[in-house]
A protein has these predicted regions:
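Conserved lysine of the Walker
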Residues: 41
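P-loop (Walker A) phosphate-binding loop of NTP-binding proteins
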Residues: 34-36
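N-terminal pre-Walker A segment at the start of P-loop NTPase domains
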Residues: 1-20
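Short phosphate-coordinating micro-motif centered on Lys-Gly-acidic
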Residues: 2-5, 87-89, 93-150
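Conserved nucleotide-sensing/catalytic segment adjacent to the nucleotide-binding pocket
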Residues: 57, 62, 68-109
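Phosphate-binding P-loop
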Residues: 22-27
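Short hydrophobic/aromatic beta-strand immediately N-terminal to the Walker A/P-loop
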Residues: 30-32
Length: 150
């Protein structure tokens, strides 16, 4: 695994970073997004959605489990917060979200081995009320090369 780490000082900067990552993704790619409640997971996904041409409102799917957005490519946004692990029946309900879309999964820990391999894993941590420490890991350096200024 290769990782980069950066501190963003505003929601706009977090969205901008997400947008740069999103521009490197293709349908079928899965990005996991982890962090405490309020760490900025949905903010990160919103920035990615904007970069992928989504113009509508991007909200947390905590109570609906998933949203599918249309943009220049389809984007699926899942939130597994309410799950303790995915049963095969629950996975069957989620599987359509993975077809032909770039997929962002919040609280991926609940998905366990049921989730397909991720192209990138994002972790957000509070630094201050506005600032976030963002770590992005990928299997190799190709996806991350040049993502942030050295």
């Amino acid at each position: 695994m290769v990782a980069i780490a950066v501190v963003t000082v505003s929601a706009d900067e977090t969205e901008e970073l997400a947008g740069r990552l999103a521009g490197r993704l293709d349908p079928g790619d899965v990005v996991t997004v982890s962090g405490e409640l309020g760490a900025g997971k949905t903010t990160f996904v919103r920035g990615a959605c904007r970069a992928l041409g989504v113009t509508g409102r991007v909200t947390s799917p905590t109570f609906t489990v998933g949203h599918r957005y249309r943009g220049s490519v389809d984007v699926s946004h899942l939130d597994l917060y309410r799950f303790r692990g995915l049963s095969s029946a629950e996975w069957g309900d989620l599987e359509p979200y993975f077809e032909g879309a770039v997929v962002f999964v919040e609280w991926p820990e609940a998905g366990g081995a049921a989730l397909p391999p991720s192209r990138a894993a994002v972790r957000l941590e509070h630094v201050s009320p506005e600032a976030r420490h963002v770590t992005i890991e990928a299997p190799d350096g190709t996806l991350l090369s040049g993502l942030v200024a050295e």
